[in-house]
Amino acid sequence: MSASYVFEPNPITSCKIIDSKENFPVRRILCVGANYVAHALEMGRDPSREPPFFFAKPTDAIINADRGANTIIPYPPQTNNFHYEMEMVVTIGKIAENLEPDETSDVIWGYGAGIDLTRRDLQKAAKDKGRPWELGKGFDKSAIISSLCPVAKIGHPKEARIWLSVNDVIKQDSNIDKLIWSVPEMISILSKTMTLLPGDVIYTGTPEGVGPIVKGDKVSGGVEGIGEVSITIS
Protein backbone atom coordinates (compact mmCIF):
# COMPACT_ATOMS: atom_id res chain seq x y z
CA MET A 1 0.00 0.00 0.00
CA SER A 2 1.46 3.33 -1.03
CA ALA A 3 1.91 6.07 1.57
CA SER A 4 -0.36 9.08 1.66
CA TYR A 5 0.68 12.56 2.73
CA VAL A 6 -1.03 15.57 4.24
CA PHE A 7 0.30 17.64 1.31
CA GLU A 8 2.13 16.91 -1.93
CA PRO A 9 5.84 16.19 -1.23
CA ASN A 10 8.33 18.60 -2.74
CA PRO A 11 9.92 17.56 -6.04
CA ILE A 12 13.24 15.72 -5.87
CA THR A 13 16.17 18.12 -6.13
CA SER A 14 18.69 16.97 -8.72
CA CYS A 15 21.85 17.99 -10.56
CA LYS A 16 22.34 17.75 -14.29
CA ILE A 17 24.99 15.39 -15.67
CA ILE A 18 27.27 16.23 -18.59
CA ASP A 19 26.28 14.47 -21.83
CA SER A 20 23.40 12.61 -20.17
CA LYS A 21 19.62 12.80 -20.00
CA GLU A 22 19.75 11.35 -16.49
CA ASN A 23 19.97 13.52 -13.38
CA PHE A 24 21.79 13.02 -10.07
CA PRO A 25 19.27 13.05 -7.16
CA VAL A 26 20.47 15.17 -4.24
CA ARG A 27 20.00 13.80 -0.72
CA ARG A 28 21.98 16.26 1.37
CA ILE A 29 24.47 19.15 0.99
CA LEU A 30 27.54 19.25 3.22
CA CYS A 31 30.21 21.96 3.09
CA VAL A 32 33.69 22.21 4.59
CA GLY A 33 34.89 25.53 5.95
CA ALA A 34 38.31 27.22 5.66
CA ASN A 35 39.92 24.48 3.56
CA TYR A 36 42.49 26.65 1.74
CA VAL A 37 45.30 28.27 3.77
CA ALA A 38 45.04 31.71 2.15
CA HIS A 39 41.26 31.81 2.58
CA ALA A 40 41.55 30.78 6.24
CA LEU A 41 43.95 33.68 6.75
CA GLU A 42 41.70 36.22 5.01
CA MET A 43 38.83 35.10 7.25
CA GLY A 44 40.95 35.56 10.37
CA ARG A 45 41.31 31.85 11.13
CA ASP A 46 44.33 29.76 12.09
CA PRO A 47 45.34 27.96 8.87
CA SER A 48 47.11 25.14 10.72
CA ARG A 49 45.95 21.64 9.92
CA GLU A 50 43.37 21.35 12.69
CA PRO A 51 40.45 18.96 12.13
CA PRO A 52 38.10 20.31 9.45
CA PHE A 53 34.63 21.56 10.33
CA PHE A 54 31.48 21.08 8.32
CA PHE A 55 28.12 22.77 7.91
CA ALA A 56 25.02 22.01 5.85
CA LYS A 57 22.69 23.66 3.39
CA PRO A 58 19.11 22.55 2.63
CA THR A 59 18.85 20.17 -0.30
CA ASP A 60 16.63 22.50 -2.31
CA ALA A 61 19.26 25.27 -2.16
CA ILE A 62 20.79 23.59 -5.24
CA ILE A 63 20.55 25.64 -8.44
CA ASN A 64 21.82 24.21 -11.73
CA ALA A 65 23.64 27.08 -13.41
CA ASP A 66 25.93 25.97 -16.22
CA ARG A 67 27.79 28.78 -17.92
CA GLY A 68 25.69 30.18 -20.73
CA ALA A 69 22.36 29.17 -19.17
CA ASN A 70 21.51 32.75 -18.10
CA THR A 71 20.63 31.77 -14.53
CA ILE A 72 19.21 34.64 -12.46
CA ILE A 73 19.70 34.63 -8.68
CA PRO A 74 17.79 37.17 -6.58
CA TYR A 75 19.73 39.18 -4.02
CA PRO A 76 18.66 37.51 -0.76
CA PRO A 77 16.80 39.27 2.06
CA GLN A 78 18.24 40.28 5.42
CA THR A 79 21.78 40.97 4.20
CA ASN A 80 23.93 43.88 3.11
CA ASN A 81 27.05 41.76 2.55
CA PHE A 82 26.34 39.01 0.00
CA HIS A 83 29.43 36.97 -0.94
CA TYR A 84 30.56 34.37 -3.49
CA GLU A 85 32.77 31.36 -2.68
CA MET A 86 33.93 29.25 -5.64
CA GLU A 87 34.35 25.54 -4.84
CA MET A 88 34.96 22.10 -6.28
CA VAL A 89 32.02 19.81 -5.52
CA VAL A 90 32.18 16.06 -4.87
CA THR A 91 29.16 13.75 -5.13
CA ILE A 92 28.67 10.40 -3.41
CA GLY A 93 27.36 7.35 -5.27
CA LYS A 94 27.67 4.54 -2.72
CA ILE A 95 27.18 4.03 1.02
CA ALA A 96 30.25 5.21 2.94
CA GLU A 97 30.81 4.19 6.55
CA ASN A 98 34.00 4.33 8.61
CA LEU A 99 36.33 4.56 5.61
CA GLU A 100 40.04 5.27 5.55
CA PRO A 101 41.22 7.83 2.97
CA ASP A 102 42.56 5.14 0.63
CA GLU A 103 39.15 3.46 0.62
CA THR A 104 37.10 6.47 -0.50
CA SER A 105 37.62 6.55 -4.27
CA ASP A 106 34.99 3.88 -4.95
CA VAL A 107 32.21 5.85 -3.22
CA ILE A 108 32.70 9.04 -5.26
CA TRP A 109 30.24 9.29 -8.15
CA GLY A 110 31.54 12.45 -9.76
CA TYR A 111 32.67 16.06 -9.51
CA GLY A 112 31.26 19.50 -10.26
CA ALA A 113 31.95 23.20 -9.89
CA GLY A 114 29.88 25.23 -7.45
CA ILE A 115 29.45 28.55 -5.69
CA ASP A 116 28.63 28.63 -1.99
CA LEU A 117 26.65 31.88 -1.75
CA THR A 118 26.91 33.44 1.70
CA ARG A 119 25.20 36.17 3.69
CA ARG A 120 28.50 37.17 5.28
CA ASP A 121 27.07 39.64 7.78
CA LEU A 122 24.65 37.04 9.16
CA GLN A 123 27.40 34.43 9.24
CA LYS A 124 29.71 36.78 11.14
CA ALA A 125 27.01 37.69 13.64
CA ALA A 126 26.41 34.00 14.33
CA LYS A 127 30.15 33.25 14.61
CA ASP A 128 30.66 36.12 17.03
CA LYS A 129 28.01 34.62 19.33
CA GLY A 130 29.18 31.02 18.88
CA ARG A 131 25.95 30.11 17.11
CA PRO A 132 25.30 27.93 14.02
CA TRP A 133 25.70 29.46 10.57
CA GLU A 134 22.43 28.34 8.96
CA LEU A 135 21.01 31.84 8.45
CA GLY A 136 24.23 32.93 6.75
CA LYS A 137 24.69 29.83 4.62
CA GLY A 138 21.47 27.84 4.28
CA PHE A 139 19.12 30.19 2.46
CA ASP A 140 17.19 29.85 -0.81
CA LYS A 141 19.22 29.32 -3.99
CA SER A 142 22.55 29.43 -2.13
CA ALA A 143 24.18 26.32 -3.63
CA ILE A 144 25.06 27.00 -7.27
CA ILE A 145 26.31 23.97 -9.21
CA SER A 146 27.44 22.96 -12.70
CA SER A 147 26.51 19.80 -14.52
CA LEU A 148 28.37 16.89 -12.94
CA CYS A 149 31.26 14.96 -14.49
CA PRO A 150 31.22 11.24 -13.62
CA VAL A 151 34.38 9.64 -12.26
CA ALA A 152 34.11 7.19 -15.15
CA LYS A 153 34.82 10.10 -17.50
CA ILE A 154 37.41 12.21 -15.63
CA GLY A 155 38.83 10.04 -12.86
CA HIS A 156 39.77 11.76 -9.60
CA PRO A 157 41.29 15.22 -10.26
CA LYS A 158 44.22 16.05 -8.01
CA GLU A 159 45.22 19.32 -9.69
CA ALA A 160 43.02 21.83 -11.51
CA ARG A 161 42.65 25.58 -11.71
CA ILE A 162 39.74 26.96 -9.70
CA TRP A 163 38.66 30.50 -10.54
CA LEU A 164 35.85 33.03 -10.29
CA SER A 165 35.20 36.39 -11.93
CA VAL A 166 32.76 39.20 -11.24
CA ASN A 167 31.83 41.26 -14.30
CA ASP A 168 34.77 39.63 -16.15
CA VAL A 169 37.30 40.66 -13.47
CA ILE A 170 39.10 37.70 -11.89
CA LYS A 171 38.53 37.60 -8.11
CA GLN A 172 39.57 34.06 -7.20
CA ASP A 173 42.35 32.14 -8.94
CA SER A 174 43.94 29.10 -7.32
CA ASN A 175 44.31 25.33 -7.67
CA ILE A 176 42.55 22.45 -5.98
CA ASP A 177 45.95 21.01 -5.05
CA LYS A 178 46.04 23.70 -2.35
CA LEU A 179 43.23 22.09 -0.34
CA ILE A 180 44.28 21.72 3.30
CA TRP A 181 42.25 18.52 3.64
CA SER A 182 42.11 16.39 0.49
CA VAL A 183 38.91 14.90 -0.87
CA PRO A 184 39.78 11.39 0.42
CA GLU A 185 40.55 12.81 3.85
CA MET A 186 37.30 14.80 3.99
CA ILE A 187 35.19 11.81 2.97
CA SER A 188 37.00 9.59 5.48
CA ILE A 189 36.35 12.03 8.33
CA LEU A 190 32.70 12.45 7.39
CA SER A 191 32.18 8.69 7.01
CA LYS A 192 33.46 8.15 10.55
CA THR A 193 31.02 10.77 11.85
CA MET A 194 27.88 9.89 9.87
CA THR A 195 26.82 7.49 7.16
CA LEU A 196 27.26 9.02 3.73
CA LEU A 197 24.66 7.83 1.22
CA PRO A 198 24.17 8.06 -2.54
CA GLY A 199 23.04 11.57 -3.39
CA ASP A 200 25.17 13.35 -0.82
CA VAL A 201 26.90 16.45 -2.23
CA ILE A 202 30.04 17.92 -0.65
CA TYR A 203 31.30 21.46 -1.29
CA THR A 204 35.03 21.19 -0.58
CA GLY A 205 35.99 24.75 0.38
CA THR A 206 36.93 28.00 -1.35
CA PRO A 207 40.30 29.64 -2.06
CA GLU A 208 41.21 33.22 -1.18
CA GLY A 209 39.57 36.20 -2.86
CA VAL A 210 36.01 35.95 -1.57
CA GLY A 211 34.09 39.19 -1.67
CA PRO A 212 30.75 40.96 -2.05
CA ILE A 213 28.39 41.02 -5.00
CA VAL A 214 25.47 43.34 -5.70
CA LYS A 215 22.43 43.50 -7.94
CA GLY A 216 23.41 43.49 -11.60
CA ASP A 217 26.70 41.63 -11.10
CA LYS A 218 27.51 38.72 -13.40
CA VAL A 219 29.44 36.01 -11.59
CA SER A 220 31.23 33.24 -13.50
CA GLY A 221 33.57 30.55 -12.29
CA GLY A 222 34.82 27.06 -12.78
CA VAL A 223 37.12 24.20 -12.02
CA GLU A 224 39.29 23.34 -15.01
CA GLY A 225 38.30 20.07 -16.66
CA ILE A 226 35.26 19.68 -14.42
CA GLY A 227 32.70 22.42 -15.04
CA GLU A 228 31.79 26.09 -15.18
CA VAL A 229 28.93 28.11 -13.72
CA SER A 230 27.50 31.56 -14.36
CA ILE A 231 24.84 33.59 -12.55
CA THR A 232 23.48 37.13 -12.65
CA ILE A 233 22.33 38.80 -9.44
CA SER A 234 18.94 40.50 -9.69
Regions from the language model: what does each represent?
Residues T206:
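Switch II (G3) loop of P-loop NTPases
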